[in-house]
From Swiss-Prot:
Protein name: Lysine--tRNA ligase
Cofactor(s) of this protein: Mg(2+)
Binding site for Mg(2+) 2: E417
Family matches, as PANTHER family: LYSINE--TRNA LIGASE, CHLOROPLASTIC_MITOCHONDRIAL, LYSYL-TRNA SYNTHETASE
Lineage: Bacteria, Bacillati, Mycoplasmatota, Mollicutes, Mycoplasmataceae
Subcellular location: Cytoplasm
Reactions the enzyme catalyzes: tRNA(Lys) + L-lysine + ATP = L-lysyl-tRNA(Lys) + AMP + diphosphate
GO cellular component: cytosol
Length: 500
């Protein structure tokens, strides 16, 4: 099976070129390093204002750089122009036979697009004014045995862009910039929280119970203990244990795993941040969330007004605040502020064609279904939707004025959820009853219900201070701030269906 690989004509030509190099004792794969003294970006910035004459009269030292060949064009039989890329920039090379020698020039003419080369030379400008390196030495550092896609067409198949991200990164500078922006956003967020005195921590990925969110878990088997365990669906319960333990501000940025669908907004493994701050409430987190979005945006964009899917969003304005029940009333006219029985709520659902599962037969669940069906998609500007029903918020503190609802909010922008936050439930007796209600829901078909976590209950019984907690989807935040249409555009290696 391993010997059945088939190669295109162009791939065979490249392999024959490599074979010849090996026979000539010039195997590029045996090169162990190439000590650069600068980068292409630094060269472009340093010499951008130098004229052709300035460079001719300049007492220059050799520049030593490296990059991938992206363009090759001959200028007669004894010279050629080549464009190379490195991580952050590109530059033109001017290669002449009389400067690098007969044998080196002959080797050079056998280089292919995609090959990685090392270069030594001095800076110049062409007659057309293009900044270039006049090469004194050109060395093949790695041979590309596969050709690159056509430079104008690129990768036409969107699936191939995601499957072969390495090729996408080679041919598309903008894709590289998106992932550099992602890293900058995460670093900015870490620095912002560190400067506030919060501590970054790491908690387990393998959990013996499912909890901390309403989601379907991945299950794996732990051989040594001969038991099934879950890949975490949230970091919440471990982080709150740390608040019990005496830390007053903790956060974790890490991978979360949910055994659910894939779409432009969902990937089964994704990155989130969860933050817990003692002695604060959800209103504190509303203000902090606005700060987070603004400081992360400033790290990658020069304007507080961003554009996403052709809609302009002003992140400098205060985010709106909307109670879930008020939003439903505004859009549908249905008033869930009124006390009502489950039967009355079911009749309203039937009238408005809202589907209700068996485990959702409660007023709180039906309120949430109305919100998701009619209100969520109408939200454009950044809006904190708060006041979620108790039934769908098993870890949030009940609102003291109306215990049907909780002190919880979600941040929505353009119909998408970006954050979920609570004034955290710290009453162990209430938490125990909420877990029992979750078990009851599971028996009625809710496969996203939380398990009973007695250890967490016991932690709360040691007293957790009033605490505010929030989760923010890093991938969606990056999508928003880089104007990326799909979550796959901000994940280096998104989950893909197996090839047929």
């Amino acid at each position: 099976m391993l010997d059945n690989r088939k190669f295109s004509e162009q791939e065979l030509v490249r392999r024959n070129k490599y074979k010849t190099l090996v026979e000539q004792n010039k195997d590029p794969y045996k090169v162990t390093n190439w000590k650069r003294n600068t980068t292409l970006l630094k060269l472009n910035e340093k010499y951008k204002d130098y004229s052709k004459e300035d460079l001719l009269n300049l007492n220059q030292e050799l520049v030593v750089v490296a990059g991938r060949i992206k363009l090759y064009r001959e200028a007669g039989k004894k010279a050629a122009f080549v464009n190379i890329d490195d991580q952050d920039s590109s530059i033109q090379l001017y290669v002449r036979l009389d400067e690098i020698g007969d044998q080196s020039f002959e080797d050079f003419r056998n280089f292919d697009l995609g090959d990685i080369i090392g270069v030594k030379g001095i800076m110049m400008r062409t007659d057309h004014g293009e900044l270039s390196i006049r090469c004194k030495e050109v060395v093949l550092l790695s041979k590309a045995l596969r050709p690159l896609p056509d430079k104008h067409a690129g990768i036409q198949d969107i699936e191939e862009k995601y499957r072969r991200r390495y090729v996408d990164l080679i041919v598309n500078h903008d894709v590289r910039k998106t992932f550099q922006a992602r890293t900058k956003i995460i670093r900015t967020l870490q620095n912002f929280l560190d400067n506030k005195g919060y501590m970054e921590v790491e908690t387990p990925i393998l959990h013996s119970l499912k909890g901390g969110a309403s989601a379907k878990p991945f299950i794996t088997h732990y051989n040594v203990l001969n038991t099934d365990v879950y890949l975490r669906i949230a970091t919440e319960l471990h982080l709150k244990r740390l608040i019990v333990g005496g830390f007053e501000g903790v956060y974790e940025i890490g991978r979360i795993f949910r055994n659910e669908g894939m779409s432009t907004r969902h990937n089964p493994e994704f990155t989130s941040i969860e933050l817990y701050v003692a002695y604060e409430d959800m209103f504190f987190l509303m203000n902090l969330t606005e700060e987070i979005f603004r400081v992360c945006n400033a790290a990658v964009n020069s304007n507080s007004i961003i554009e996403y899917n052709n809609v302009k969003i002003d992140l400098s304005k205060p985010f709106k605040r909307l109670h879930m029940v008020d939003g439903i009333k505004q859009v549908t006219g249905v008033d869930f502020w009124k006390e009502m029985t489950v039967q009355q709520a079911l009749e309203l659902a039937k009238k408005h064609k809202v589907h209700v599962e068996k485990h959702q037969e409660s007023v709180g669940h039906i309120i949430n279904l109305f919100y998701e069906e009619f209100v969520e998609s109408t939200i454009v500007e950044p809006t904190f939707v708060y006041g979620h029903p108790k039934e769908i918020s098993p870890l949030a503190k009940s609102n003291p004025s109306d215990p049907r609802f909780t002190d919880r909010f979600e941040l929505f922008i353009l119909g998408r959820e970006y954050a979920n936050a609570f004034s955290e439930l710290n009453d162990p007796i209430d938490q125990y009853e909420r877990f029992k209600a979750q078990i009851e829901e599971e028996s009625k078909g809710n496969d996203e219900a939380n398990d009973m976590d007695i250890d967490f209950i016991e932690a709360l019984e040691h007293a957790m201070p009033p605490t505010a907690g929030i989760g923010i989807g890093i991938d969606r935040l990056v999508m928003l701030l880089t104007n990326s249409e799909s979550i796959k555009d901000v994940l280096l290696f998104p989950q893909m269906k197996p090839r047929e």
